[in-house]
From Swiss-Prot:
It is found in: Cytoplasm. One of its GO terms (molecular function) is 3'-5' exonuclease activity. This is Error-prone DNA polymerase. One of its GO terms (cellular component) is cytoplasm. NCBIfam families: polc, PRK05672.1. The keyword Protein transport does not apply. GO terms for biological process: DNA repair; DNA replication. The lineage of its organism: Bacteria, Pseudomonadati, Planctomycetota, Planctomycetia, Pirellulales. InterPro entries: DNA_pol3_alpha_NTPase_dom (IPR011708), DNA_pol3_finger (IPR040982), DnaE2 (IPR023073), DnaE2/DnaE/PolC (IPR004805), DNAPol_HHH (IPR029460), NA-bd_OB_tRNA (IPR004365), PHP_dom (IPR004013), Pol/His_phosphatase_N (IPR003141). Pfam families: DNA_pol3_alpha (PF07733), DNA_pol3_finger (PF17657), HHH_6 (PF14579), PHP (PF02811), tRNA_anti-codon (PF01336). It is an enzyme of class 2 (transferase). CDD domains: DnaE_OBF, PHP_PolIIIA_DnaE2. Its EC number is 2.7.7.7. Keywords: Cytoplasm, DNA damage, DNA repair, DNA replication, DNA-directed DNA polymerase, Nucleotidyltransferase, Transferase.
Length: 1145
């Protein structure tokens, strides 16, 4: 081992060069500390070196020292720096393969799956395998990307493996090469270079020249990939002059002693010839050889997946990419024994990997993030400005005097913010909110930031944390060691204004969107692998429809069999393996919905940036988890559809009811609103419109704001898994039965009747009951997410139980508390988050209760959002007394509008042109402009001429029955649209001549059923009738009940119902239970399918949109379900009907 360490441990980073004699002295000094060696060392030159230099100078084969050897080359830099010698005791020849255990190696060229369809292993898999094989280090060098480097950093630290950041580039005018930055400055230059190449191209591409590389080369090591294994050696020889010219000239000029020639061998038939060619090229150009594996996957078994992803990237089958497939499976991380054998003639190339690794001192933890500081006025520091704004805001929040408790809390928070240097971050978020409100954009902070009184004083959040006793350490603590996360919701239709404000303020060089790594899910993996294996599209389509959309499905083999693909055949097994492995692989980068990173310096020197799909945006290559891992702050500028709907509803209420409302002026304790909530009449409102929430409302019976906070939080996986729901409901029925071991615990749990509902309560319990510090309590909360990993939670469990015991609490109570805390995991809802959301819950419920027309119009204008499709929202509005009118060319605006009706308590609702599928908004705008200018349209010709519509635009409107006011009937309108000229003013001389719009007598008007089917196809809903109404006679013969009949039936009776499937929901915490919403002409029905029923009727349940169901009715406390026992397919009756459906996990 020592001989290799002596040979490879030299530092190559110094610019000072030593003589061969000095070098030999250094090696002798090192050997004195290595057992098995002696001070007098002889050096044996490798076979190919002796042969290469035999003609140039005579020298002794053995025993020749460096002093005796002086190659007749003008530039001897490489001859001095290279390591061709091998050390051995005198008289005993050293054989490379005999000393494998002493060999040191770093793999410097690895593509992970973040090369996007050109790598077949996750970064952490590569790191784990390299450590298992005894490598000293590993470099992740994805192609023109650093998107995956953070994923392997923490695993490498845990395993003690040197982790090197690099990249592989393919310049347009030079051979491809691998780059490794040596320090932080070099890393910044590499990122800027890659950003330059990506910003000049469309999303996902990179274009670099060697000049670009040369401009950023300072401090960067480079290895040239001089061979192309798709060519024969003879073809490579034809390019040897070009390679020599590049290596001797531009490459040496730019990289000097930082340049290498990469040597990779993969047990090809021409490895010997390739080695000779590389040796000759290295000696001729004075560029040293460097061993690398050109790794594409961590294990040889992944070769099949690599072939698959390459085929996917090219849109071909595996059989069609023969020329682009790897020759064999040797592009994996190989054992040291294999490396020793492959490089037996050039061991210096292996030793030089240690040399490169020693020169690469940069690590990701050297990235020091600096937030923009220019928001502070001149003459003030950011912390001084933050303090001034905070105290000004406090006086505004408490105009009668800031309470002493608040003053104390503010001082604590500001001190912590100053100590952790987060003041500029808070100022940036404050500036965003200030800008939004100056533009009358509705916004509200939420999440853990609602724990902060500073955020409340700055106007970022709307919940007073002193009223709800929120925990600031849930937001920021010294022990957490990570950045705070402030989430701000903006109207989703105006959020882009806020984003562009940031780009204008900081520039695209200092601001960028956070990335989202779009990964393969089950359905997409099935389709892509199926194409790559050339499996019949019909079979793959059937498998994809039957399989789940998200994660791995243990029933996939059975689903394949159902679709006609035998999973026991070689093809079937291959398909299953590739599909299962591909799930979770990154497919491409997209932009986060709102995560934004701003920096004091250049963002592209912190991380690679590229163009987003949307013009005017930049996106960095790291996602939110990557940023958290390396401590980079981001601002979440999130889009919330309900804020858009509330803003729109406020406008309509002001215009039609002459009442100006805001979130702060809505009456806080409106009895009719709470009556509606208790009746679970909450379709379309915020957060409490889901099946589970609507089932909980009649049992919880919210009657105040804090009840809504609990309602929002309790229907979450955490409380459900921690078995907190039923105990809380029982305590709600009998509050006096709640028990508290001591007053400290009573203070924590009294507001939730002795049951921990919120994450903050779990943390406070650890503090008051077990003696945790607030920071330790937050670490406990985070450890809950990893409780399935052995050992992670045990240390907290012991500390928790012992702490409770020391405080006099019995073991049963302590174990119960721990069980409840563990149930949260990452699913427990923070009280701060629930409190912020509860404000919007109440506001949306108030608007629905008192202004149902305006509320429905606002929801329709804010789509897509929420659980329900427009058809269900409109039906719900009709049940609340709202008259809804169809789209009409002479009355509809682009958005829905309200029409006063003196004979009704609520205005009428006219649907807008935006409801017509396939009608561009620009066309709708032309129609409105023409109508406003010269009045209603008289006929089709008038519409075509004045609005300058194309024939296809007229046909789209006719199909949607939007021309009813100017045409005989729908079918006639379609016929007449065909007679219109395709351009309203293309023939000015004949403009006054109307086309022949007569309708043939044999053109029969559509039947009511056809009308409804066309309504669904063109607008997603029908105001004429419900499709099920046309099947009612047949359903009555089958003894099917209507939805309106179910509340009248007693609990436990057998029922048969039928309808259209609107929604399927299968939560991960429901133990395989699927919840389904089905609708008939009288209303909706809630169905429950247990796992065995879902499995038995899987084909129908998954693929059909119309069912007949037999089951048992549950009718308890106003909550009605049908527990399904049997499902029949009604899709034949619904053939051709395009029912809007929303499926959720």
């Amino acid at each position: 081992m020592c001989s290799w360490r002596c040979a490879a441990a030299r530092s190559h980073a110094s610019a000072n060069r030593c003589t061969p004699k000095e070098r030999l002295g250094r090696q002798e000094n090192r050997s004195a500390h290595c057992p098995g060696t002696i001070r007098s060392i002889r050096m044996e030159w490798s076979r190919w070196e002796r042969q290469e230099f035999r003609c140039k100078r005579s020298f002794q084969r053995l025993g020749s020292s460096c002093e005796q050897f002086s190659p007749p080359m003008q530039n001897r830099r490489w001859e001095i720096e290279r390591l061709p010698w091998r050390f051995s005791p005198v008289g005993k020849p050293f054989h490379f393969r005999d000393n494998v255990r002493a060999m040191r190696y770093v793999e410097l060229h690895c593509r992970s799956n973040f090369s996007f369809l050109d790598g077949a292993s996750h970064p952490d898999e590569l790191v784990q395998r390299a450590a298992e094989l005894g490598y000293e280090g590993l470099a992740i060098t994805d192609r023109e990307s650093i998107a995956g480097v953070v994923r392997g950093f923490s695993p490498a630290q845990e395993l003690g493996l040197q982790y090197i950041v690099g990249t592989e580039v393919h310049p347009t005018d030079a051979p491809p090469m691998v780059l490794w930055p040596t320090d932080r400055a070099a890393y910044g230059r590499m990122c800027r270079m890659l950003s330059t190449g990506r910003m000049r191209c469309e999303k996902g591409r990179c274009e670099l020249s060697f000049e670009d590389i040369a401009e950023h080369a300072q401090g960067i090591l480079a290895g040239v990939i001089a061979t192309d294994e798709s060519r024969s050696i003879e073809d490579q020889h034809a390019h040897v002059n070009d390679s020599r010219q590049f290596l001797r000239g531009p490459f040496r000029d730019v990289f000097d002693d930082r340049g290498y020639l990469l040597a990779s061998f993969h047990r090809g038939v021409d490895d010997a010839a390739k080695a000779t060619w590389l040796r000759n090229l290295s000696l001729a150009t004075d560029v040293p050889l460097l061993a690398c594996g050109d790794v594409r996957y961590h294990s040889a078994e992944r070769m099949a997946l690599h072939d698959c992803v390459v085929a996917i990237s090219q849109g071909k089958s595996v059989e069609q990419i023969q020329s682009d497939r790897l020759v064999n499976s040797q592009h994996h991380l190989r054992s040291l024994e294999e490396i020793a054998e492959l490089y037996r003639d050039v061991p210096d190339a292996v030793a030089r990997t240690i040399e490169v690794a020693q020169r690469c001192t940069f690590t990701l933890d050297q990235l020091k993030y600096e937030y923009p500081v220019e928001l502070a006025p001149e003459g003030m520091t950011p912390i001084e400005h933050l303090k001034r704004l905070t105290w000004e805001g406090a006086r505004g929040r408490w105009p009668n005097g800031v309470p002493e408790k608040v003053i104390e809390t503010l001082r604590h928070e500001v001190t912590l913010i100053e100590d952790l240097q987060y003041e500029a971050y808070f100022l940036t978020v404050w500036d965003l909110v200030r800008f939004a409100r100056s533009q009358e954009i509705l916004c509200q902070g939420r999440g853990s930031a609602a724990n902060s009184v500073v955020c409340y004083c700055l106007g970022i959040t709307s919940v007073d944390p002193t009223h709800t006793d929120l925990l600031f350490e849930r937001f920021i603590s010294r022990e957490r060691g990570e950045a705070p996360d402030i989430d701000v919701d903006f109207e989703h239709q105006r959020r882009e204004e806020v984003l562009q404000y940031l780009y204008e303020k900081y520039g695209r060089d200092r601001a960028g969107m956070t990335a989202v790594v779009t990964c393969y899910r089950a359905k997409s993996a099935i389709r892509e692998v199926g194409k790559a294996l050339a499996i019949s599209p019909d079979i793959i389509d059937a498998v994809a429809k039957l399989a789940g959309s998200y994660s791995r499905n243990p029933e996939l083999p059975e689903r394949c069999r159902d679709a006609g693909l035998d999973p026991d055949t070689p093809l079937g097994r291959r398909f299953l393996y590739l599909t299962e492995t591909l799930i979770g692989f990154p497919r491409h980068l997209s932009q986060h919905v709102g995560g934004m990173v701003m920096t004091a310096g250049s963002l592209c020197e912190l991380c690679v940036t590229e163009n987003a799909a949307m013009p005017g945006r930049s996106v960095i290559q790291w996602n939110k988890d990557d940023l958290d891992d390396i401590g980079i702050l981001k601002v979440d500028i999130l889009a919330l559809g309900m804020l858009s709907a509330i803003r729109r509803c406020f406008e309509l209420v002001k215009d039609h009811h002459n009442r100006e409302l805001s979130l702060s002026t809505i009456p806080p304790d409106d009895t009719p609103t709470y009556d509606m909530i208790c009746a679970a009449d909450t379709m379309g409102v915020f957060q409490i419109e889901s099946r589970a929430q609507m089932s909980m409302l009649p049992r919880l019976k919210p009657r105040c704001y804090y009840d809504l906070v609990i309602e929002v939080a309790i229907v979450r996986p955490g409380p459900i898994q921690g078995n907190m729901v039923h105990p809380f409901l029982a305590a709600r029925e009998n509050p006096a039965a709640a028990k508290y071991p001591n007053d400290a615990i009573r203070k924590v749990l009294e507001k939730t009747l002795g049951v921990p509902i919120f994450q903050e309560q779990a943390m406070k319990l650890a503090v008051v009951a077990a003696g945790f510090t607030p920071g330790e309590a937050d670490q406990l909360r985070r450890a809950m997410a990893a409780w399935r990993r052995p050992g992670v939670i045990d240390r907290f469990r012991t500390k928790l139980l012992e702490g409770m015991k020391a405080n006099g609490l019995n073991g049963e109570f302590a174990e119960n508390v721990f069980r409840q805390i563990r149930g949260f995991g990452e699913y427990g809802f923070p009280e701060s988050h629930a409190a912020s959301f509860a404000l919007l819950v109440y506001a949306s419920c108030y608007l629905k209760r008192h202004y149902p027309t305006a509320f429905c119009a606002a929801l329709l204008d804010s789509q897509p959002m929420g659980f329900y499709a427009p058809a269900q929202l409109i039906r719900d509005a009709q049940q609340h007394g709202v008259q809804v009118l169809p789209v009409d060319i002479n009355d509809s605006n682009i958005r829905s509008k309200l029409i006063p009706d003196l004979n009704r308590p609520h205005p009428k609702l006219r649907l807008g042109l935006q409801m017509v599928r396939g009608l561009p908004s620009a066309v709708a705008q032309k129609i409105i402009v023409a109508r406003d200018a010269n009045g209603p349209f008289a006929n089709l010709h008038d519409l075509t001429t004045r609005a300058k519509l194309s024939r296809s635009n007229i046909a789209t409107l006719a199909d949607a029955d939007a021309l009813a006011s100017i045409a005989q009937d729908r079918r006639a309108a379609v016929w007449q649209s065909l007679a219109q000229d395709d351009s309203g003013d293309s023939m000015p001389l004949l403009a006054d001549l109307e086309p022949d719009c007569s309708v043939p007598e044999e053109l029969v008007p559509m039947s009511p059923a056809e009308e409804v089917k066309n309504d669904y196809a063109t607008t997603g809903l029908s105001l004429k009738a419900h499709p099920v109404s046309f099947w009612r006679d047949d359903l009555n013969a089958l003894r099917c009940k209507r939805a309106s009949d179910l509340p009248k039936l007693r609990d436990g009776v057998h029922v048969r119902v039928a309808g259209l499937v609107l929604m399927r929901q299968r939560p991960g915490t429901a133990k395989g239970i699927t919840f389904v919403t089905m609708e008939d002409e009288t209303g909706s029905m809630n169905l429950v399918l247990f796992a065995q029923v879902w499995k038995r009727f899987f084909k129908i349940a998954r693929g059909s949109d119309a069912w007949i169901v037999d089951g048992k009715l549950e009718n308890k406390k106003g909550v009605i379900h049908v527990i399904v026992g049997r499902v029949e397919d009604l899709s034949e009756k619904a053939s051709g009907l395009k029912v809007p459906r929303r499926d959720f996990r």
